[in-house]
Curated annotation (Swiss-Prot):
It is a single-pass membrane protein. This is Uncharacterized protein AF_1221. One of its GO terms (cellular component) is membrane. It comes from Archaeoglobus fulgidus (strain ATCC 49558 / DSM 4304 / JCM 9628 / NBRC 100126 / VC-16). The chain crosses the membrane at residues 25-47. Keywords: Membrane, Transmembrane, Transmembrane helix. It is found in: Membrane. The keyword Transmembrane applies.
Length: 48
């Protein structure tokens, strides 16, 4: 559980470092959600 949270926090930090503190747009939200979903899928499959 903690590992998943750390990965999500890392994804959020990576997203913020990539896009800076720009105003939130639908594109950035889509990228953030997409990246988190991909990471969750990889994390889930790695533990099966």
């Amino acid at each position: 559980m903690s590992a998943k949270m750390e990965i999500l926090l890392f994804a959020n930090l990576a997203h913020k470092s990539m896009f800076g503190m720009e105003p939130v747009t639908f594109a950035s939200i889509g990228v953030t959600v997409g990246v988190q979903i991909v990471i969750l899928l990889i994390w889930g499959l790695s533990w099966r």
